[in-house]
Design a protein with these regions (language model features):
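Short N-terminal micro-motifs specific to bacterial/archaeal maturation
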Residues: 10-13, 20, 126, 211
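Membrane-interacting alpha-helical segments
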Residues: 12-34, 237, 241
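A generic helix-loop boundary/linker signal
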Residues: 9, 16-17, 110, 199
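Hydrophobic alpha-helical transmembrane segments and adjacent short intramembrane/lumenal linkers
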Residues: 133-248
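Short hydrophobic/aromatic-rich motifs at helix boundaries and adjacent loops
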Residues: 1, 88-93, 177-181
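Low-complexity, intrinsically disordered extramembrane tails and loops of integral membrane proteins
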Residues: 1-13
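Membrane-cytosol interface at the C-terminal ends of transmembrane alpha helices
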Residues: 25, 110-125, 154, 199-212
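Selected alpha-helical membrane-embedding segments in polytopic membrane proteins
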Residues: 15, 28-148
Length: 248
């Protein structure tokens, strides 16, 4: 007779256990949560990331103001007139987003990434039982590295002179951090996805699809690449539109 102890231990695992083990044993987490929903983890991440987002609002608001000023200046240099009322309204909404954005953005992001995860799973050969619910559970756990990303932002806000920052990419952990913020916006956005935490999340999704969708381990990296490319579609579109318009 098989030993029921492992199953019992898995049933006793809490959401806190998941938040710890997703860093060290993601396969075990996805295996025991294969039939679980995503709502609880989505709520936890919304609260945690939202709280960190709120704590970093001073840094984020300053960076967003600088980014908007840079874009308005670039538009003026091209002969485009931006009404003062539009500038004031943009900064107002930027301030609201800098304070409360994550409380809305995290759940929406998880639901959208869940759709991308479902499509990725079908592309790499996930089984027929791999549906949106399972895919969104994987997507929710893939957001856990964003907690560390927000903590990294907090540290930078303490150690750096944020008054010199003119682009959000300058406080990111991506390749775009080291590039001129005035370069082609589409290319900058694309290189902004070459980011430690974005890549980490993509790999977690690949692992989740392999475990929950019952694909082979050899398909983890291809799945991670596909979901990364899905996320890069807006940047690629921006790059294409810029090329068609002749934008440098």
């Amino acid at each position: 007779m098989s030993d029921p102890t492992p199953a019992a231990a898995a049933e006793k695992a809490t959401i806190i256990d998941d938040l710890i083990e997703i860093w060290t044993s993601p396969t075990a987490v996805f295996r025991r949560r294969a039939e679980s929903g995503y709502f609880l983890m989505m709520c936890v991440l919304t609260v945690v990331i939202g709280a960190l987002f709120f704590a970093n609002r001073g840094v984020l608001e300053g960076v967003m103001d600088a980014e908007m000023n840079r874009r308005f200046a670039a538009a003026a240099a091209e002969g485009q007139t931006v009404p003062p009322e539009a500038i004031a309204m943009a900064k107002k909404w930027g301030g609201i987003f800098g304070t409360f954005g994550a409380f809305v953005g995290v759940p929406i992001g998880i639901l959208l990434v869940g759709l991308g995860t479902l499509l990725t799973g079908k592309i790499v050969g996930a089984d027929d039982e791999f549906g949106y619910r399972k895919a969104t559970m994987i997507a929710a756990y893939s957001f856990v590295p964003k907690i560390l990303g927000m903590l990294a932002l907090t540290v930078q806000g303490v150690l750096m002179d944020t008054n010199t920052i003119t682009s959000p990419y300058q406080i990111s952990t991506s390749v775009a951090r080291f590039l001129d913020p005035n370069m082609n916006a589409g290319l900058l956005a694309l290189l902004g996805r070459v980011d430690i935490f974005t890549l980490w999340s993509s790999i977690l999704i690949g692992i989740g699809i392999a475990v929950v969708g019952k694909t082979s381990r050899e398909r983890i990296l291809p799945a991670a690449a596909v979901i990364w490319l899905f996320g890069a579609v807006p940047a690629c579109w921006q790059l294409l539109m810029g090329a068609l318009r002749g934008t440098p």
